[in-house]
């Protein structure tokens, strides 16, 4: 069954911080990786442990997409945040997070 994708306002702001090329890569990955079986762990998708931001992470090269899933009555993937990783640091919305 196909999942609906829903971006939070913050996620849209995060996405706009990237170049048009990078936005295209990220959006293509979201559409191909999260429309079907977004809750199946793969090489690029994994459940997050002890993370307050989201329950799942999608890796797109250096970019990270953090999302939650509603599997109950309606199938929705909520895109919560989008950032990029540089070595052991994660940047989301211009803020740095240590990993």
Task: Spell out what each predicted region is.
Residues 1-30:
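Arg/Lys-rich, positively charged N-terminal/basic patches that mediate binding to nucleic acids
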Residues 2, 60-63, 68-99:
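Enriched for short, Lys/Arg-rich terminal
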Residues 5, 46, 77:
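A broad, low-specificity signal marking well-ordered, structured residues that form hydrophobic/aromatic
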Residues 8, 49, 80-83:
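Residue-level detector of conserved, well-ordered beta-strand and adjacent loop positions
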Residues 13, 32, 36, 84-87:
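Active-site micro-motifs of SAM-dependent methyltransferase domains
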Residues 15-17, 46, 57-59, 68-70:
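Short histidine-centered beta-strand/loop micro-motifs
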Residues 32-57:
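A short, surface-exposed loop/turn module that caps and links secondary-structure elements
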């Amino acid at each position: 069954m196909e999942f609906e994708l829903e971006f939070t306002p913050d996620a849209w702001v995060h996405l706009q911080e990237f170049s048009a090329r990078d936005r295209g890569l990220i959006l293509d990955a979201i559409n191909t990786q999260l429309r079907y079986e977004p809750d199946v762990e793969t090489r690029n998708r994994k459940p997050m442990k002890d993370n307050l931001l989201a329950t799942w992470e999608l890796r797109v090269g250096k970019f990270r997409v953090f999302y939650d899933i509603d599997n109950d009555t309606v199938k929705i993937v909520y895109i919560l945040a989008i950032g990029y990783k540089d070595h052991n640091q994660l940047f989301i919305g211009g803020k740095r997070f240590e990993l």
